[in-house]
Amino acid sequence: MTEEHVVLLDEQDKPSGTLEKYAAHTLNTPLHLAFSCWLFNEDGQLLVTRRSLSKKAWPGVWTNSVCGHPQQGEAIEEAIIRRCRFELGVEITDLTPIYPHFSYRAIDPNGIVENEVCPVFAARATSVLQVNNEEVMDCQWSVLEDVLRGISATPWAFSPWMVMQASDDNARELLSEFANGN
């Protein structure tokens, strides 16, 4: 894969430039655009993934199915499809906004800062997973309610963005409806 960049955002969340992805994620990360996707199978189970130990931020933690950054000029939906293929080797359908105005700032144990405007989507997997082990060290299809209980009981085991997304009542309701095929 070619060198990835992040789209930097100004105070009004408008694109203001780009920066190489690894240069952007530091102790002083500028605000940038990202996305999160919660991927479900035909049985309504959620794919939770464990971030590779080689990840710069939050290595080894469990998180939602796929996250990433759109490239300059790339629609978020196109970026989600690209990252699902790259990280999980999977095709998706029914891409649906769940929490379009989610944003957060979090600091990982190594001091790396995430500072993102990060729309959240749900989608359905339409093919068998072929996981890229450089991105994902483990994954599991789980019942959404079980995952939400796990997040509540042990939030430290999950990415902060997943915990924050799961704590939003409206997002939880929309994810549950999506899982149930509504």
UniProtKB/Swiss-Prot annotation:
Presence of keyword Metal-binding: yes
Location(s), subcellular: Cytoplasm
Nudix hydrolase domain location: 30-164
Main location: cytoplasm
Annotated catalytic residues: C67, E116
Superkingdom field: Bacteria
GO molecular function (one): isopentenyl-diphosphate delta-isomerase activity
Catalytically driven reaction(s): isopentenyl diphosphate = dimethylallyl diphosphate
Keyword Metal-binding recorded: yes
Gene3D superfamilies (UniProt xref): Nucleoside Triphosphate Pyrophosphohydrolase
EC number: 5.3.3.2
Binding site for Mn(2+): H25, H32, H69, E114, E116
Matches recorded under InterPro entries: Idi_bact (IPR056375), IsopentenylPP_isomerase_typ1 (IPR011876), NUDIX_hydrolase-like_dom_sf (IPR015797), NUDIX_hydrolase_dom (IPR000086)
Pfam family, one: NUDIX
UniProt pathway: Isoprenoid biosynthesis; dimethylallyl diphosphate biosynthesis; dimethylallyl diphosphate from isopentenyl diphosphate: step 1/1
Entry note: cofactor: Binds 1 Mg(2+) ion per subunit. The magnesium ion binds only when substrate is bound.
GO biological process terms on file: dimethylallyl diphosphate biosynthetic process; isoprenoid biosynthetic process
Keywords: Cytoplasm, Isomerase, Isoprene biosynthesis, Magnesium, Manganese, Metal-binding
GO CC annotation: cytoplasm
Cofactor: Mg(2+); Mn(2+)
Subunit description: Homodimer.
Family listed: Belongs to the IPP isomerase type 1 family.
Role noted for this protein: Catalyzes the 1,3-allylic rearrangement of the homoallylic substrate isopentenyl (IPP) to its highly electrophilic allylic isomer, dimethylallyl diphosphate (DMAPP).
Record-linked HAMAP family: Idi
Name the record gives this protein: Isopentenyl-diphosphate Delta-isomerase
Organism of this sequence: Salmonella arizonae (strain ATCC BAA-731 / CDC346-86 / RSK2980)
